[in-house]
Design a protein with these regions (language model features):
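Active-site loop-to-helix "anion-binding N-cap" substructures in soluble metabolic enzymes
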Residues: 1-124
Length: 124
């Protein structure tokens, strides 16, 4: 069994127009056989359910390793899974810089993602 290539797009803190939601389904067929490619979008948290409802494989831009608690502004891995995400970014350089995320925190993110049946995308 060979691995599929993952083509993913991170929207960062930029909402995309509805027309962009069709792009992930169309782009891989243009360049690669569709059976060799998986696609995913990492939209803003507010756009995740719109993308999922449009049939797009979706991931969270980050996830907190704890299930709940006093973590203002964070979203847990469990929450991401419950709304339908398949992937989550862990250790993105912007999160490490802007939010002072350490290697230990990123390791906890990866473990929590796996425990919650999300596929972690570890940024190095």
């Amino acid at each position: 069994m060979s691995r599929k290539i993952l083509i993913a797009g991170n929207w960062k803190m930029n909402p995309a127009p509805l027309s962009a939601q069709a792009t992930p389904k169309q782009a891989p067929e243009t360049y690669l056989p569709i059976d060799t490619v998986d696609t995913a979008i990492f939209p803003t948290f507010l756009d995740i359910t719109k993308c999922i409802d449009a049939g797009i494989i979706t991931g969270g831009q980050s996830g907190h390793p704890e299930e709940s608690g006093a973590h203002t502004g964070d979203v847990s891995m469990k929450m991401l899974k419950e709304i339908g995400c398949k992937y989550v970014l862990c250790g993105h350089s912007e999160r490490r810089q802007d939010h002072y995320e350490t290697n230990e925190f990123v390791s906890a993110q990866v473990s929590s993602a796996i425990e919650n049946d999300l596929m972690p995308i570890l940024c190095v």
